[in-house]
């Protein structure tokens, strides 16, 4: 866990400082059943702990997906432009 707090985990998209740890980790522990509690209900009701922070995270994820789609479209457009090679005279250039 020290590596995650120091930011050495390059695979995580969202930094841990973005979250209020108490509001995020406790519902996750309740959901996964790792938190030792007397209630044996396994229902995972995270809607009660939703805050504006959670909603903004969902919006950011959707925006990232749209940006990725836009990037793939740009790459395809560039590929189409490159399909027409410039006509070469066949003279000069390479000497073997």
From Swiss-Prot:
Positions annotated as pro-peptide in this chain are 1-73
User: Compositional bias (Low complexity) spans?
Assistant: 35-49
- Source domain of life: Eukaryota
The GO biological-process annotations, alphabetized, read as:
cellular response to hypoxia; defense response; innate immune response
Residues with site note (Required for ligand-receptor interaction): 90
Q: Which InterPro entries match?
A: PEP
Keywords, ordered alphabetically: Plant defense
Q: Does the keyword field hold Chaperone?
A: no
Q: Where is this region: Disordered?
A: 32-96
Pfam families linked to this entry: Pep1_7
Composition skew (Acidic residues), residue ranges: 52-71
State what this protein does. Elicitor of plant defense.
- Family (UniProt): Belongs to the brassicaceae elicitor peptide family.
Protein's UniProt name = Elicitor peptide 3
Species name:
Arabidopsis thaliana
